[in-house]
Structures are given as C-alpha cells and as structure tokens.
Amino acid sequence: MPVSQSWWQVEVHCDPLLEDLLYWRLSEAGGRGFVCESKAQGLQVHSYFPAELWEETIRDRLLQEINADAADLGLPTPSLSWQTLDEEDWSESWKRHWQPQELGDRFLIQPAWLEPEPSDRLLLQLDPGTAFGTGAHPTTQLCLEGLETVPVADKVIADVGCGSGILAIGALLLGAKQVYAVDTDPLAVGATQANAALNDLEGDRFWTAIGSADQLQPLHAQGVRFDGFLCNILAHIIQALTPTLSELASPGSWAIFSGLLTSQADTVSVTLEEYGWVIRDRASQGDWCRLVADFRPER
C-alpha cells in the first residue's frame, strides 16, 4: 500500500493542562489511538489518522480549535506537526509508546506483544490496531473503574461503540454471561474480534456486529434481555441513542456513559432522565466525565 494511502502520525506539543481538551479535539477529528508522554517542555501527544481523514480542511480546523482552547485557558500556543507512516511503521510506532497499565482495582491492560509479568490482577491482553481504546484515555479508565461498581457476573451486557473491545472484554473477564458489542467502524469490530481471541473469549459469550444500538433491536425482539450497557462515545451520540437504549433496557438495567466532558454532563443527564434513567454515580478525571445510571421508568 502506498504511504499516501495509509496513515498520518500527528504530534502535538502543548501545556499539560490542555491534555483533556486535546484528546477530545483529536477524537472528534477522527484520530485513532492516543499516546501521551511527559517532556521537560510540556506534553507530547501522538494520534494516528487514516490518510483519507487528514485533509487540509481538517488540519486547519483542528489547529484553530486547539489554539483557541489554549488561548481561552491562558496557555502557550501548541505546536502541531505530522508525518506519513505506512502500516508497518504505524504498528511499530504504536508499540514503542505503549506499556502495561494497571486500571481500577482489578485490571491489568497488557500489550499483546509483551510477555506479561506475574500479577494477581485480571489480565486483559490488547492489540488495539487502528481502533480507539488502549486504556490510556481517561474515558476508558473511567469506564473500566465503573465496571467494578456494577453487577456484571452472569449478566448480559451491550457495548455500544466498542472500539478495540477493551470494555466488552473487561466485562467478560468480570464474569458477564454474554456481551454484545457493536461499532459503526468496521476496523473497530475487527479489532474487537481479534482482541477477544487474544483473551480466549471467542464463542457464544461474545457477539459483534457493525452498526450501532439499532443492531441490538432484533435481538431484543427475540427475547434477549440486556442487564447493562457500556457507552464510551461522544456526548451528542449518547443523547441521540438514549431513546433506543431505553427501549432495549429493562427496569433495573444499568448503564455506564462516558466520552463526555464534565461541562456536558448536566445536559446529557437531563436527556437520560427524560427517558427513565436515574444517575446514581458521577466521576471525573480531568475534563472528562463518567455517568453510571439505572433504568427506572416507573418512578
């Protein structure tokens, strides 16, 4: 494959206080995966864009947005640079930057290409490929921590916007009976399937499909009862999917919502409550927020 048809590595140097907003801007622009390193001069963030998404208009808009964010916070102007990578270089670049990571009280996120060290934690092996979700992003961390607070064992769970599959696999490692994972990005679904195989979780317990929550409706019509939902997606998508999720839920179902900024949490909460969800926990990391909600339509 020609270099021009593969990947762009985008590198941003910025003040550490800009980290959370920068993750959000890169996600919205189409970035796949994030690597963050602390440097003496500040923060260095790498993200990876498919070649077709790194157009001049996207570059210009992203630069304007992050410069405006820095100005609003009174921070130095970030620097933005990029270079092309072929598939092999992309993979090797990713692997150089990513190391094992303990998350929550129970998980150890393990790069699949490294030999795991002995640990009493739940080993979650991962090769994210081009999909979002390594455990490095605050919203992924918040969701995994949230999973430790809800009933998972022997439950049926849906992961809407599964990315690399990290949350779906986490649920299975915690003893979920079945997990149904969907994503509108075919590359993400492929990564989820591959990561399930890495963790020996193929079979009847794990189901994937390309699409969104609408892919779960036929299953619900056939009698599948969803006990929990994982939604690490952007705020406006959570709001748009709330009616469908409410149709799929049963009284007592729970949901974990992240991918939203703390400044968006109140607006998202209002939408959820209009459709019968009760927010029982709210946590944040930097500018990012997680909501845990229970479905109680007959309050």
Curated annotation (Swiss-Prot):
- Among the entry's GO cellular component annotations, what is one? cytoplasm
Q: Write the record's keywords in alphabetical order, separated by commas.
A: Cytoplasm, Methyltransferase, S-adenosyl-L-methionine, Transferase
- Organism domain of life: Bacteria
Q: What is its EC number?
A: 2.1.1.-
Q: Cellular location of this protein?
A: Cytoplasm
Q: Which reaction does it catalyse?
A: L-lysyl-[protein] + 3 S-adenosyl-L-methionine = N(6),N(6),N(6)-trimethyl-L-lysyl-[protein] + 3 S-adenosyl-L-homocysteine + 3 H(+)
List this protein's GO terms for biological process.
Answer: methylation
Keyword ATP-binding in the entry? The reply is no
Q: Which Pfam families match?
A: PrmA
- Xref: InterPro entries: Ribosomal_L11_MeTrfase_PrmA, Ribosomal_PrmA_MeTrfase, SAM-dependent_MTases_sf
For S-adenosyl-L-methionine, which residues are the binding ones? Answer: T140, G161, D183, N232
Which family does the record claim for this protein? Answer: Belongs to the methyltransferase superfamily. PrmA family.
**Function of this protein?**
Methylates ribosomal protein L11.
| Stated name of the protein | Ribosomal protein L11 methyltransferase
Native source species: Synechococcus elongatus (strain ATCC 33912 / PCC 7942 / FACHB-805) (Anacystis nidulans R2)
Taxonomic classification, please?
Bacteria, Bacillati, Cyanobacteriota, Cyanophyceae, Synechococcales
Q: Which gene encodes it?
A: prmA
